[in-house]
Amino acid sequence: MEVKTLGELCNIVSGGTPSRSKVEFWKEGTIPWIKIGNIKEKYVNEADEYITQAGLDGSSAKMFAKGTVLYTIFATLGEVGILGIDACTNQAIAGLTIKDTNQLNTDYLYYYLKSKKNYVNKISRGVAQNNINMSMLRSFELPLPEISKQEEIVAILDKVFAIINDRQHELQKLDELIKSRFIEMFGDLKKNDKGWKILRFSDFAKIDTKMIHDFEEYQDYPHIGIDSIEKGTGKICGYRTVKEDAVASGKYIFTPEHIIYSKIRPNLNKVALPDFIGVCSADAYPILPIKGKCNRTYLAYVMRDKVFLDYILAFSNRTNLPKVNKKQVEGFSCPIPELNLQKRFEDFVKQ
């Protein structure tokens, strides 16, 4: 099978941001200006900000035609979408315009880029700003079967992802039900309208950082990086073993008794409940609830709640790279209901 680079197959350029200080670049703008947060589905049809023609002409922003494939290259890496409208983007997004559509199918390119997400996050590690440059993107190699075969692959993947999307919508409804039950049982934790006893974090949990550097006996253990934890839901997915990831730097041990909390970019709200033993990135904290004081499931949902998120973001927003430390987490206080009520909530979640 023929293999070509993205640079051979596509014209690839990044977007730009018109100066915010120039009102005429933004006021009454009509040109959609796409940001990472707008890439939520396969097709990108909406923007929440618009620029003027003067803003487009007076900046590095570029107009991309409907059908252009968008790929995020800065901060949140590897998000992919296909423009359903003519639009421009900020500099965190690259636009890929296929040179010859008889050689490369747009949807095939979309699915190929989706498959590269773990790879781009891996090669970007160690880069201070968490990004990939245009040269790296242009060098990605793409297997290139005949166009008819590409269309067959796309048809199969469309069906697969339709099933996945349906399942995700079901899980989203379930997650909303759980959050609703949480509020029903425990009230608004910020107001503590049910009058629960307030305890400091260190009174009901501890940050249990047992770091290992020698991985000889841990080769078959799951290795959970922060990219393996889904934002908001805490679902653990896409991980490999210590051996497969060729882990060399220090990691933390965790068990099914721990919560894994990502301390990097806490706005992503990555709070996981593992049901196996493994090692996790040093960019996360294994948190161990104290028996007799706090239930693991209850604490995980507290940490996903606005009461914890607002508290922790007040610290992380003061730095260029949002990150929280041990002292800040341990300084958190929250209502701790009776254990039997926490257990009832856990039983509801497990149903």
Segment roles from a protein language model:
Residues 7-22, 37-66, 202-213, 226-256:
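Sequence-specific dsDNA recognition surfaces
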Residues 120, 308-311:
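Periplasmic-binding protein-like
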Residues 165-166:
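Contiguous mid-protein beta-loop-alpha structural module that forms a pocket-lining wall or clamp
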Residues 35-36, 46, 50-114, 250-252, ...:
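A short beta-sheet element
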Residues 19-26, 126, 197, 214-222, ...:
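Short coil/turn segments at secondary-structure boundaries
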Residues 2, 73, 87-94, 113, ...:
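A short glycine-rich beta-alpha junction/loop motif
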Residues 1-17, 41, 139-155, 170-212, ...:
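Non-catalytic DNA-recognition/assembly elements of restriction-modification systems
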